Amino acid sequence: MNIERIQLKGQLAESKAKFKNLDVEASALVILIRSLLNPFEEDTTKLETQKALVSMQRLDELLLELRNLKSKIQKLEEYFE
């Protein structure tokens, strides 16, 4: 097995681990955002929109990174098929 192949397998493993961690963080942010923007709150002035906005911005960053990682993982997996 050549060195490049071993390095690519390492990149694949790292990418999968990073994807898993970011996916968990994204899921947690979705739960947090839903709690901050409670649809059952009758007084909309009590909604914590600033906190939700910051969380949404982070979620947007995570989703972009997750999409890029997913593409990278697919390409690496295709290489090893």
Residue ranges of predicted features:
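Short, charge/polar-rich alpha-helical segments
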Residues: 1-27, 57
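Long amphipathic alpha-helical coiled-coil segments
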Residues: 64-81
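A short, terminal or domain-edge coil/loop segment
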Residues: 3, 41-42, 79-81
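Generic cytosolic/nucleocytoplasmic N-terminal low-complexity/intrinsically disordered segments
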Residues: 1, 8, 17, 42-45, ...
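Acidic, serine/threonine/proline-rich low-complexity intrinsically disordered regions
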Residues: 51-63, 67
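Short E/K-rich amphipathic alpha-helical oligomerization segments
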Residues: 20, 24-56
